[in-house]
């Protein structure tokens, strides 16, 4: 028995390695491009990153993948990817070593990542430089080992192994701002969706969302509210801390949550980030736990995520600027995105380094994630490393490896490459991000959502409304970022404009390497459809607009390594929103307002007709709550064309900003056309259902009647035959009896005659 088992294990491992290498190969070209930009933009930082890499290498934590060391992710450019740490499961205290190395660069963020063993890599560095605080540490650790819980120095609680989340540390305040913005937008923080979403294993960490954006602080304040929502799924304290969302606490919380990676090598990224962190700017480290949606610290007050990174960076001033509301509801990953976006251009952070490490962590996460989530896939491992949103925002989008660690190596490689290539966002915003300035709105068509069937796909971007809003923002910006274009990115000009206005410095570029998952971007940005991928296909929808990236929209792309190398805004969102009831409705109707609405209605009519009505009220209530929170958080944003209607299925893309601007109004009524289409779809589905039911009944009446009649006839015939036989039998018996009696009389007569003769 042992021999076949060993053979199967070996085969599975080899296949995973091959998949990872393939994914890495796909990601390489983009990474190199990014690296070039980074080299020009951040030579000084690159040196720092290199030193960090060296430190990280020395202290490398084990990669979650099997024993053989992961491929070195070091990019040719500024950051050598921290070499992939050996895959040993044991988590060496490398974290501490890394931390210290980083600490020399900047206050070390004690980023205890308790990899596989729950051992926290304690960094001897000052606690206050908690991983999140390090700007450079935009690390997205996604080790998924359920066993290990990683505790960031200030973590309220060690992240639970089950909730292995990619931890993303936005290095700069801008990143954090973005994170909060995303949080608000993607998750109306209060909306339960965000919570459930965070929980879903499938959710991808949208590194894109993490893209460090150095947007204005407009969204900053809104973030805390959104942050307040705790994710039910997240085991991490993310849920509790997010509510506080004080800059330090929220940030720290995010970090704590995010450092779920149980796997050994989560931490490796951090050291590099620290060195990058030359600038005091704080990186928010938001790692999203699949189960637990990490909290994205919305409030970047002058203390960046203190809890997470406990870093009080002098540059916090910008933090408000950048804080983006991230909608956590969509994905636990939202926090990650927020983090990356955080940097507004403050200081170059070691985002690149973080990114490098991130990939490794990510891979780790990947493997463990399934365990953590139980049935759920580890896809939520996608780690975003918003690298220093400022100086060197290097964002690597790690997309989760959907199954196990397939993606682990490739993801790591991608992350590392991206980090190297990405240029600091704040400093080089114009260089890198202007091209990227256009926000991509990856609207995954509802058709995508229809594919949601699989447990992984189960993460429907529940936070459709909020997602939509975020995606819409990206739309305004150019549809194509400098070299990349999202396969399914559609730009909504008006919303994009708003977003760009908000996040001008942050041009988030999300590029996804071609992913098996095909997600369709609907032209109407407003309907950011929840993208739900098919059971296995992971939808990786990086969204360039930092505010725009709704975690819900992107799902994991199992084999795609996100090419989001945009230093600034690449963020990978993983969305898992199995808990959301209206995920299905959203998926079925999608947020494609006009184009995909009817088609989607037709597709999902049968399944979700009845659900839509039931869920409408619930969703409306949730939306109202979301809108209120958004109003509070995003006072400056202007109303979108329309906010999502009460019905999730028909939710138009609703930017969080837009929602906020609706201050008195929960949501704007959708256009008459949209209502009409929606109603038509509902009526059509109802009619079809009635016809189907009636036809079934009418068709069954005849055969059933004939069958019953035939059965009765047969029973009657049998009974009649039985009765006839009984009569015949009785008559025969009677006849025999008479005969017998006759015979007996004859006998008696004979006997009498004989006796009489004798007597004579």
Curated annotation (Swiss-Prot):
The modification Phosphoserine is found at residues 755-756. Residues 722-760 are cytoplasmic. It holds the Pfam family ARMH4. Keywords: Glycoprotein, Membrane, Phosphoprotein, Signal, Transmembrane, Transmembrane helix. Residues 594-635 have a biased composition (Acidic residues). Residues 49-69, 117-143, 216-243, 373-392, 474-495, 536-652 are annotated as: Disordered. Residues 216-228, 474-484 have a biased composition (Basic and acidic residues). Residues 28-700 are extracellular. It is found in: Membrane. Residues 380-390 have a biased composition (Polar residues). Glycans are attached at residue 56. May modulate immune response and may play a role in inflammation. May negatively regulates AKT signaling by modulating the activity of mTORC2 complex through RICTOR interaction. This is Armadillo-like helical domain-containing protein 4. The lineage of its organism: Eukaryota, Metazoa, Chordata, Craniata, Vertebrata. The gene is ARMH4.
